[in-house]
């Protein structure tokens, strides 16, 4: 606040999962995507504390003259409903997803693995690695078993580059970049699915170590 600059927060992994109060946090702009809280893809929201920001698309008077073009009302309504349902069940969903996350970590205790994170983390995403096991191979084997994980964030989906987040945190030469997988959880996952993942990981690693 000592500088004449606006403070923007990409809250895509927080909205619908945590209680977010932009005014209390001193946030000027906050953005989120509907699909992250189970709303329609291709629609998002922008919170602004400073309504006098310039418009990017010119032509029409839609959205208070800030973004010209016809509004996608069906998607906007779907996003609003999805956000309402997510916030209404915020605490219950958080506790349930946390139980799934803890179930995974407990189920993998007898395996050699490491957790990429700090002490402060959300339960919705686990980033774990298995020493000596290529994440590309693990990704393929899990996919063949009908289990979807990734080696990076959704922002880098489709690329062959290692996770830029892990590279920034551990260094570009870290073995973690080639060993780590990203597991995303939601309130729609079940304990049966988690148990299937745990069993499948044990089976795959047993086979790989046996090669």
PLM regions with names:
Residues 1-211:
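Pyridoxal 5′-phosphate
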């Amino acid at each position: 606040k000592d500088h004449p600059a606006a403070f923007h927060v990409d809250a895509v992994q927080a909205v619908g999962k945590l209680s977010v109060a932009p005014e209390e946090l001193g946030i000027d702009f906050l953005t989120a995507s509907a699909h992250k809280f189970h709303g329609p893809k291709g629609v998002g929201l922008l919170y602004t504390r400073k309504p006098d920001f310039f418009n990017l698309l010119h032509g029409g008077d839609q959205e208070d003259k800030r973004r010209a073009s016809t509004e996608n009302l069906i998607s906007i309504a779907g996003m609003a409903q999805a956000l309402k349902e997510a916030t209404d069940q915020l605490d219950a969903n958080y506790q349930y997803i946390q139980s799934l996350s803890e179930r995974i970590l407990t189920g993998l205790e007898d395996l050699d693995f490491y957790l990429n994170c700090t002490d402060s983390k959300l339960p919705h995403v686990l980033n774990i690695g298995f020493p000596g096991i290529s994440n590309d191979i693990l990704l393929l084997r899990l996919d063949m078993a009908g289990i979807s994980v990734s080696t990076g964030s959704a922002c880098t989906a489709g690329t062959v580059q290692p996770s830029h987040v892990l590279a920034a945190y551990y260094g570009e030469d870290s073995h973690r970049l080639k060993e780590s997988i990203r597991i995303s959880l939601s309130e729609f996952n079940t304990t049966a699915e988690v148990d299937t993942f745990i069993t499948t990981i044990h089976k795959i690693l047993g086979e790989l170590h046996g090669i």
